[in-house]
């Protein structure tokens, strides 16, 4: 007989097959899902559509409060492009020289330095101009700021004071201290140009022959040799005057707006002297940068912001901030205007505006300044104690020192090096920078970290050498860098500071600038060394020390 199939077995087998099939199908589905996910993950994702037409703007520090106010008002208005993008300004405060480098590196799409001089620097050496559309929105004349009684001693306000009066005062009074910024700043370069104009007896069309004429160059050199020291710019000068008062300087070159700014903060009043020979202006432009990838919407944002700067609302704000507006419908003699004699300035001045020459002539003015400037003796006092080996600090300091040596460009400047650890060692006497730059760099590169911190002995060594040289016709200065606390000197802090105070009056005035490198530097000691000389102490770290040495180089 044939064997009959068991129905229960058939049913069980069928169920098992269904389960296996379901599992297989499930695994296939999972694998397909993973494959799809990985495919989507590895595939280029669409770039989200932009929601803003952003303009990245760098602006010079002296107009920080004004620019922040303007940008906040513009962004609050929520202007939009025809395509619906929100127009936005992102503004960054930056020194003009750094602004030029950042613009050339593609970091910004617009800039607003204190002078159009910097726009030429942005395009220098480029085949294709980077600077596009530009316009000025605020102006301020270059003036000589003086204490009211100092100006009166020169005949103010009955007499119009000029560069010759300043020269006569500096020659007749050895205690008279005046300054202007380095020619690496717009204010300093415009001042130097004004001096050359005065020496040439011109107000227009200055030529290269005028700059090299012996009578003119002798006049400028005589004036420059009475400068106490130079500096990094007008904002830094005003900050020092606010901190130290009239003992810091008797007269100094800044913009008119800075006189108003200072007088609003102090009971000791400055007056603005508009040189009788004529003066120049800082014109505060805003310029679009033709960066690769600049969009039409970003251009529209620039133009909208430009028009906003020129609007009646913002031009009134410009005037309220102490600048002169470019809108000539706004009267400087309006009762609400800060440009008034009560604030130390004169809305009817300057009577004579000097003509701006070509970029080629301006380059020649700067190179001529290096020949005419007051020469300097500069000692670099360098901490090489054991702690300088930490965090690669010594290597960063060496790079910064070498950068400083590159920045010192005066034809007659001298630089020396005084390293210290357990004691002063391996000193390099003052050398002519133009012929010994490489040798000085080599000595800097040989420095090694070891030992303790004989800071006071090192400063005393450099100070005594400058006193022995007795070269009062030079700027004499010590730039000190230390990362720690004095613990190895034979001279006491009190003995050293008393010697400095005494000899700076009876002997050779020496400026001392101190860098506290890192968080362990003793600023009580550094300030005690710097303050009596008219110098200052500032903090740096491995990321900022190179920039600080570069800033300090502008004082010489």
Question: How does the language model describe each region?
Answer:
Residues 40-48, 326-379, 386-393, 406, ...:
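Acidic, polar low-complexity linker/tail segments
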Residues 44-184:
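N-terminal segment of the mature folded domain
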Residues 132-144, 217-224, 266-294, 298-299, 306-329:
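Periplasmic-binding protein-like
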Residues 203-274:
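Ligand-binding pocket segment of bilobal, Venus flytrap-like solute-binding proteins
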Residues 267, 484-533, 538-540, 549-551:
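VWA/integrin I-like adhesion module and closely mimicked acidic/polar interface patches used
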Residues 371-432, 448, 455-460, 474-482, ...:
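Von Willebrand factor
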Residues 414-446, 461-472, 489-494, 522-532, ...:
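Short beta-strand-loop
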């Amino acid at each position: 007989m044939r064997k009959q199939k068991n129905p229960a077995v058939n049913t069980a087998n069928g169920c098992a097959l269904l389960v296996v099939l379901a599992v297989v199908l499930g695994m296939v589905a999972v694998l397909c899902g993973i494959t799809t996910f990985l495919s989507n993950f590895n595939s280029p994702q669409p770039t989200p559509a932009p929601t803003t037409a952003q303009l990245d703007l760098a602006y010079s520090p002296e107009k920080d409060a004004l620019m922040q106010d303007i940008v906040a008002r513009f962004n609050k208005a929520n202007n939009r492009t025809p395509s619906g993008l929100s127009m936005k300004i992102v503004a960054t405060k930056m020194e003009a020289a750094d602004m030029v480098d950042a613009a050339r590196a593609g970091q910004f799409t617009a800039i607003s330095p204190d002078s159009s001089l910097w726009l030429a620097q942005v395009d220098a050496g480029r085949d294709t101009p980077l600077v596009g559309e530009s316009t000025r929105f605020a102006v301020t004349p270059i003036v000589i700021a003086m204490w009211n009684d100092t100006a009166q001693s020169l005949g103010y306000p009955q007499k119009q004071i000029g560069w010759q009066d300043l020269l006569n005062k500096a020659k007749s009074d050895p205690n008279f201290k005046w300054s202007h910024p380095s020619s690496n700043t717009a204010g300093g370069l415009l001042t130097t140009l004004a001096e050359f104009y005065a020496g040439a007896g011109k107000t227009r069309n200055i030529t290269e022959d005028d700059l090299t004429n012996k009578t003119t160059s002798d006049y400028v050199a005589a004036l420059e040799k009475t400068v106490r020291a130079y500096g990094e710019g007008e904002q830094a000068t005003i900050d020092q005057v606010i901190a130290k008062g009239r003992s810091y300087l008797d007269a100094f070159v800044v913009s008119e707006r800075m006189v108003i700014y200072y007088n609003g903060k102090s009971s000791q009043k400055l007056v603005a002297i508009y040189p009788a020979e004529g003066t120049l202006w800082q014109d505060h432009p805003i310029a679009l940068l033709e960066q690769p990838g600049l969009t039409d919407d970003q251009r529209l944002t620039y133009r909208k912001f430009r028009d906003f700067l020129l609007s009646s609302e913002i031009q009134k704000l410009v005037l309220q901030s102490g600048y002169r507006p470019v809108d000539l419908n706004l009267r400087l003699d309006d009762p609400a205007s800060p440009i008034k004699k009560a604030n130390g300035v004169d809305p009817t001045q300057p009577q004579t505006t000097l003509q701006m020459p070509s970029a080629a002539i301006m380059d020649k003015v700067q190179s001529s300044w290096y020949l005419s400037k007051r020469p300097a003796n500069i000692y670099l006092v360098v901490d090489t104690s054991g702690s300088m080996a930490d965090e690669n600090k010594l290597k960063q300091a060496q790079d910064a020192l070498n950068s400083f040596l590159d920045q010192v460009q005066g034809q007659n400047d001298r630089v020396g090096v005084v390293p210290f650890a357990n004691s002063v060692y391996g000193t390099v006497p003052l050398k002519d920078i133009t012929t010994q730059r490489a040798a000085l760099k080599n000595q800097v590169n040989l420095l090694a970290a070891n030992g303790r911190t004989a800071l006071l002995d090192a400063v005393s060594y450099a100070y005594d050498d400058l006193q022995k040289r007795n070269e009062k016709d030079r700027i004499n200065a010590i730039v000190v860098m230390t990362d720690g606390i004095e613990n190895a000197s034979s001279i006491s802090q009190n003995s050293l500071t008393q010697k400095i105070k005494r000899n700076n009056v009876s002997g050779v005035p020496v400026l001392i600038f101190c860098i506290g490198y890192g968080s362990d530097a003793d600023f009580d000691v550094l300030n005690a060394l710097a303050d009596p000389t008219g110098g200052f102490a500032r903090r740096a770290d491995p990321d900022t020390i190179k920039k600080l040495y570069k800033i300090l180089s502008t004082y010489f």
